[in-house]
């Protein structure tokens, strides 16, 4: 049925017990129905919560009572009625209905249970994601994610950053390697962008010396774990006339701001998830790479200097370290060509990772801004400088010193929500096995 002139007057969060006697119109989905014979209770769900519709047969019209009795779970309805204070109902109030309009009837049986009384496996949930997202515990994840992204934008704008949009159709790899999705671009081969890194650095040559981007990146990596996806949202910044220490401070202050904002604006969502977020103190603890290797070995996990952190090493660190912390001074040999080596010890670099317990959520570095050194490093990694011609040209005409980082939005949201599976932080995740819905 169509709405006609009917419109919602209140969401669930807008109604309070003090509104006893007020007339309201509410709209949403039939979450649950309890028919006790002479009285029917309907839990109506909207984006903000649940509203109890209480229908006593002796107090409402006979035809209305019959219509309520016929309702099916997850049908879309509009109720009008009178607010009545009730200590037993959600939010301390109930609505005694005066009319019902059924806007759409849901097919039965349901592929999964939005009340969560019957649990479903992750694949079942993702196959029927539109229903899964109706669960309060699932919608809470994305309310927090939305606030996090909003907070990031506000914070970076306050710090003088300009939002940019870089190409997602690219001619070559950002860092070499094979983690690329090839596509046909007219008569040529192109790829989905795996990182905005090179474009961020090119922007440093334009005079727009503080930029950020929040956008999808695509990586055809082999990993099929609870922490990896093939399409994610990356929060990237780049800034000129700064070094790695400066952008690390920006990153830790951003994390603090986000947590403060989520605590302030997402109290209901956090309560739904059973989460209590402590605001971390700054500066975050810093471990040099060499220290991290020693700590990993002390936990009985073999790791050699010069290796990237394997999963076992991350787990070992997570048992020692709590909260957010940086790993700094990574070996130059295992970092990308654009990472600046330490002038006093070229075997070490000005690169860092931000960790949350055993989870890497961000990587960044001071960048190489000298053209000749950059060409040398590209060659040293077995890559052809000719493949980076348009990138390198920006370094020949006045490139300032610069630094930056990329922060994984989904992994960051895992730290806020306490989720263990990154797929749960994406509306419609893409991994090696899933391309729909």
UniProtKB/Swiss-Prot annotation:
Keyword Aminoacyl-tRNA synthetase: yes
Entry-linked Gene3D superfamilies: Bira Bifunctional Protein, Domain 2, Nucleic acid-binding proteins
Site features described as Important for tRNA non-discrimination, chain residue numbers: 90
CC terms in the record's Gene Ontology section: aminoacyl-tRNA synthetase multienzyme complex; cytosol
Compartments (UniProt record): Cytoplasm
Sequence positions that bind ATP: 219-221, 227-229, 360, 408-411
CDD domains: AsxRS_core (cd00776), ND_PkAspRS_like_N (cd04316)
Cofactor, free-text remark: Binds 3 Mg(2+) cations per subunit. The strongest magnesium site (Mg1) is bound to the beta- and gamma-phosphates of ATP and four water molecules complete its coordination sphere.
Keyword Cytoplasm: yes
Domain of life, source organism: Archaea
Region described as Aspartate: 197-200
Listed PANTHER family: ASPARTATE--TRNA LIGASE, CYTOPLASMIC, ASPARTYL-TRNA SYNTHETASE
Function recorded in the entry: Aspartyl-tRNA synthetase with relaxed tRNA specificity since it is able to aspartylate not only its cognate tRNA(Asp) but also tRNA(Asn). Reaction proceeds in two steps: L-aspartate is first activated by ATP to form Asp-AMP and then transferred to the acceptor end of tRNA(Asp/Asn).
Stated family: Belongs to the class-II aminoacyl-tRNA synthetase family. Type 2 subfamily.
HAMAP family recorded: Asp_tRNA_synth_type2
Descriptive protein name: Aspartate--tRNA(Asp/Asn) ligase
Organism this protein belongs to: Methanothermobacter thermautotrophicus (strain ATCC 29096 / DSM 1053 / JCM 10044 / NBRC 100330 / Delta H)
């Amino acid at each position: 049925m169509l709405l006609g002139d009917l419109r919602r007057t209140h969401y669930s969060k807008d109604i309070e017990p003090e509104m006893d006697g007020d007339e309201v119109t509410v709209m949403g989905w039939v979450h649950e129905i309890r028919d006790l014979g002479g009285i029917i209770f309907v839990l109506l769900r909207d984006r903000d919560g649940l509203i109890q519709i209480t229908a006593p047969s002796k107090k409402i019209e006979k035809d209305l009572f019959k219509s309520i009795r016929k309702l099916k779970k997850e049908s879309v309805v509009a109720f009008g009625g009178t607010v009545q204070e009730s200590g037993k109902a959600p939010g301390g109030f109930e609505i005694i209905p005066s009319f019902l309009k059924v806007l759409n009837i849901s097919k039965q049986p349901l592929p999964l249970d939005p009340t969560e009384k019957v649990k479903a496996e992750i694949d079942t949930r993702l196959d029927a994601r539109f229903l899964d997202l109706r669960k309060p515990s699932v919608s809470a994840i994305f309310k927090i994610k939305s606030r996090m992204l909003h907070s990031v934008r506000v914070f970076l704008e306050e710090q003088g950053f300009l939002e940019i949009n870089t190409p997602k159709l690219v001619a070559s790899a950002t860092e070499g390697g094979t983690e690329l999705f090839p596509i046909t671009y007219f008569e040529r081969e192109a790829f989905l962008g795996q990182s905005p890194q090179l474009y961020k650095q090119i922007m440093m040559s334009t005079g727009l010396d503080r930029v950020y981007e929040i956008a999808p990146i695509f990586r055809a990596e082999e990993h099929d774990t609870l922490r990896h996806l093939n399409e994610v949202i990356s929060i990237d910044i780049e800034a000129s006339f700064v070094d790695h220490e400066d952008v690390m401070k920006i990153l830790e202050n951003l994390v603090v701001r986000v947590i403060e904002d989520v605590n302030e604006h997402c109290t209901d969502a956090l309560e739904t998830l059973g989460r209590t977020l402590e605001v971390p103190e700054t500066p975050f603890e810093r471990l040099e790479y060499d220290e991290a290797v020693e700590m990993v070995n002390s936990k009985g996990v073999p790791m050699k200097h010069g290796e990237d952190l394997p999963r076992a090493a991350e787990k070992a660190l997570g048992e020692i370290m709590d909260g957010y912390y940086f790993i700094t001074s990574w070996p130059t040999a295992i970092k990308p060509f654009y990472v600046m080596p330490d002038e006093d010890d070229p075997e070490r670099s000005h690169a860092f990772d931000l960790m949350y317990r055993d989870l890497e959520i961000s990587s960044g570095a001071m960048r190489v801004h000298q053209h000749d050194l950059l060409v040398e490093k590209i060659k040293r990694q077995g890559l052809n400088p000719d493949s980076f011609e348009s990138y390198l040209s920006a370094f020949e005409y006045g490139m300032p010193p610069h630094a930056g980082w990329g922060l994984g939005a989904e992994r960051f949201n895992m730290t806020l929500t306490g989720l263990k599976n990154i797929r749960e932080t994406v509306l419609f995740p893409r991994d090696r096995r899933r391309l729909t819905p």
